[in-house]
């Protein structure tokens, strides 16, 4: 199979996917190495295909951000140590919240944003396992723990309840500072 055919099939596969697809799975499906898939994704992005990488795999951007219009969407500003990240995510998910992303405002690079796509406890476990396995550091380590999350909730009252619970455990950054 030629590279252009593989990339066309890759876009079709991502278009049909309802969940993120890991590069290793795609590599196995197409009979190439993981690194070839990573390169294909880079080439497709340069060709104006909006593919995002989450900690769970690749996803087309329109699928990642398709949110029911009846749900409330807002941003929260948090500050915590790395060992409090699971508590933060658990509070949000236990209320029925969906953590779309994390953002930090780096003094040199400006806004750095990463897709999370965390909807349930299993996603939190996967995130935690991936961080442990890679010995990775939180993006917020660049900004003294300060970061933002875009979250989607069933309604505004749920969003406010999440904020109250995060504030109660000292994770929500005090808006009066």
Predicted regions and their residues:
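Basic helix-turn-helix/winged-helix DNA-binding cores
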Residues: 65-68
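N-terminal helix-turn-helix
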Residues: 20-53
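Solvent-exposed alpha-helical segments within well-ordered globular domains of core cellular machineries
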Residues: 8, 12, 39-42, 90, ...
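Mid-protein regulatory/catalytic core that forms ligand/cofactor-binding pockets
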Residues: 70-177
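Conserved beta-strand edge residues that scaffold enzyme active sites
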Residues: 28, 58, 106-107
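Extreme N-terminal segment that seeds HTH/winged-HTH DNA-binding domains in transcriptional regulators
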Residues: 1-28
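Residue-level detector of family-conserved "landmark" positions at structurally sensitive sites
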Residues: 24, 54-55, 102, 176
